[in-house]
UniProtKB/Swiss-Prot annotation:
Keywords: Autocatalytic cleavage, Calcium, Disulfide bond, Hydrolase, Lipid metabolism, Metal-binding, Phospholipid metabolism, Secreted, Signal, Zymogen. It is found in: Secreted. CDD domains: PLA2c. Ca(2+) binds at residues 50, 52, 54, 71. Residues 16-22 form a propeptide. It comes from Canis lupus familiaris (Dog). Belongs to the phospholipase A2 family. GO terms for cellular component: cell surface; extracellular space. It catalyses: a 1,2-diacyl-sn-glycero-3-phosphocholine + H2O = a 1-acyl-sn-glycero-3-phosphocholine + a fatty acid + H(+); 1,2-ditetradecanoyl-sn-glycero-3-phosphocholine + H2O = 1-tetradecanoyl-sn-glycero-3-phosphocholine + tetradecanoate + H(+); 1,2-dihexadecanoyl-sn-glycero-3-phosphocholine + H2O = 1-hexadecanoyl-sn-glycero-3-phosphocholine + hexadecanoate + H(+); 1-hexadecanoyl-2-(9Z-octadecenoyl)-sn-glycero-3-phosphocholine + H2O = 1-hexadecanoyl-sn-glycero-3-phosphocholine + (9Z)-octadecenoate + H(+). This is Phospholipase A2. GO terms for biological process: antibacterial humoral response; antimicrobial humoral immune response mediated by antimicrobial peptide; arachidonate secretion; defense response to Gram-positive bacterium; fatty acid biosynthetic process; innate immune response in mucosa; lipid catabolic process; phosphatidylcholine metabolic process. Binds 1 Ca(2+) ion per subunit. PROSITE patterns: PA2_ASP, PA2_HIS. Monomer or homodimer.
Amino acid sequence: MKFLVLAALLTVAAAEGGISPRAVWQFRNMIKCTIPESDPLKDYNDYGCYCGLGGSGTPVDELDKCCQTHDHCYSEAKKLDSCKFLLDNPYTKIYSYSCSGSEITCSSKNKDCQAFICNCDRSAAICFSKAPYNKEHKNLDTKKYC
């Protein structure tokens, strides 16, 4: 059910110009590159205090810290002169990359902002692949624990 809610939110946001489904799909595919058996939209949305929309408090584990770092990376992207986003949103930036085995390479043809966002997503996907997944942190009560 939560997946359907996420899909609906992504569709509405994309229709309003906020989130590009293609950009979200790129990040999803990067995670699939490093963790082929994962289902990123299901596994990592609504995990801990930072994985999913928004984030606050102290990360509950290493994986949640990966999401906090990814959020921070996107915040840094917003400060770059080369990154002027539609509706101030890094999720709209499309970039080029390749996946070979579990190795992600951001294309040298990316412009500065694309390269920055690609590396944010690449670093997060690699971080996810190294962090343990704790099922008890999925759908965490963020009001209580964050």
